[in-house]
Amino acid sequence: RGGQCVRLLQGRFDAETVYGNDPGVILGRYRDLGARYVHVVDLDGARDGSQGNRAAIARLARAFADTAIQVGGGVRSRKVAAELLGLGVQRIVIGSVAVTQPAEARQWLEEFGPDRIVLAFDVRLDAGGTPRLTTHGWESQTEASLWDAVLTYQPHGAMHVLCTDVARDGALSGPNLALYTEAVRRFPKIQWQASGGVSCGADLVALAATGAAAVISGRALLENRIPAAELVPFLPNA
């Protein structure tokens, strides 16, 4: 956000922690440990669609051409999607468009290919335990369920789905293992990316056991809560 490396607590822009002025330093640290993929979120873009961090993303893509970068936040038009992929970004993450403009998102899947598109569904559990979708930087909640959303895209070749339990994001409270276990059970052909709540190496082991293909961790890594010896075995795979 604003060119800095930051984390929000549960998607709240008034609960921001700054971890550094140069995201490249942090990305380099992960690359040197053996990370094949790095997940980057343009929080300004996620909030209002602005592209003020585009230059920073371009620098990361150039400087770390040997590391695949997936970028989300504010990818709300075909023009922005194509420009990001043109910068050397390996995958783009689409959230609000996937929820509110499914026809547009399906066109991107067909045009850019399912391996270049990650469908991001940020969820809050309702009183009955059903994961309901949120949009626009987690500030708007819908009545649509995660399961219905994935069903919409599966016939169109969707391959990668990133699911974040918003209530756990940045809280170091442990991931929602039941959510990802159920996601893999319902849609075993989807490459699920689990996000939210990771706090230690044991969480990575537990998430791997759910069948999730990848795990996204922010705060736990930025605060060095996962020792390198526990982290490195997972990096070549996700």
Predicted regions, residues:
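N-terminal beta-alpha supersecondary unit
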Residues: C5-Q51
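Conserved, mostly hydrophobic/aromatic
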Residues: Y30, V38, L84, L119, ...
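Catalytic cores of alpha/beta
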Residues: R62-I92, A103, A178-S217
